[in-house]
């Protein structure tokens, strides 16, 4: 991913699949959601194929690979199964994420510093198929520096702590943590993306941080789409982040 001169919006469609899997039906179709998102201005589509297959399925990923007009950001755990699948589909972008079976959603960043050899091997292997590999990490200098050392060209900073902050002082503290992480990542020569827990009422402050390349947003878009439709939900978010980034 070349660094854009404007902030990009990656739309995560996992929770369209969550709604489908709740009843084991064929609808709603995450592929349809992805195409609608592209029409509404999404710069890319993010999907997470989890080990437990709780939402996105292999078939979804294969279909998306064939029909997307933008690009796929394939989120995956660092497992042999996922590595082999990624080598099969060769997505434009791969984001390595931590994964545990009991979590409701990804609860924290990947501990790159604690497993550098393993992550370095994964980055090298996935880079050979032409994918740009990013690491989903906390906005922590130790993890950012480790990401640089293992050869990842990009990182995605976990904004969950900011999203969960309740008091004004906590929000300010966590926002500063993200902003500092962005600055440090850029100083390391990394492409810096961000995401997790962002919605229509908290995204503007993050989008205004200079240097962020892309925001990945999913749950809030799917929830808002229940009331306004998916295209409108994506379009509204795109308008918000572009306006915030210009100021």
Swiss-Prot record:
Enzyme Commission (EC) number: 2.6.99.2
Enzyme class, broadest EC rank: transferase
Catalytic residues (positions): 48 (proton acceptor), 75 (proton acceptor), 196 (proton donor)
Q: Which UniProt keywords apply?
A: Cytoplasm, Pyridoxine biosynthesis, Transferase
Question: What Gene Ontology molecular function terms does this protein carry?
Answer: pyridoxine 5'-phosphate synthase activity
An example Gene Ontology CC term for this record = cytosol
What processes in GO biological process is this protein linked to?
Answer: pyridoxine biosynthetic process
**Pfam families found in the cross-reference section:** PdxJ
> What residues does the record give for site: Transition state stabilizer?
156
Q: Which domain of life is it from?
A: Bacteria
- Quote the PANTHER family the UniProt record gives: PYRIDOXINE 5'-PHOSPHATE SYNTHASE
Query: What is annotated about its quaternary structure and interactions?
Result: Homooctamer; tetramer of dimers.
Briefly state the protein's biological role.
Catalyzes the complicated ring closure reaction between the two acyclic compounds 1-deoxy-D-xylulose-5-phosphate (DXP) and 3-amino-2-oxopropyl phosphate (1-amino-acetone-3-phosphate or AAP) to form pyridoxine 5'-phosphate (PNP) and inorganic phosphate.
Which HAMAP family does the protein's record reference? Answer: PdxJ
Family in the record: Belongs to the PNP synthase family.
Q: What is this protein called?
A: Pyridoxine 5'-phosphate synthase
Q: Which organism is it from?
A: Pseudomonas fluorescens (strain Pf0-1)
The beginning of the lineage is:
Bacteria, Pseudomonadati, Pseudomonadota, Gammaproteobacteria, Pseudomonadales
**This protein's encoding gene:** pdxJ
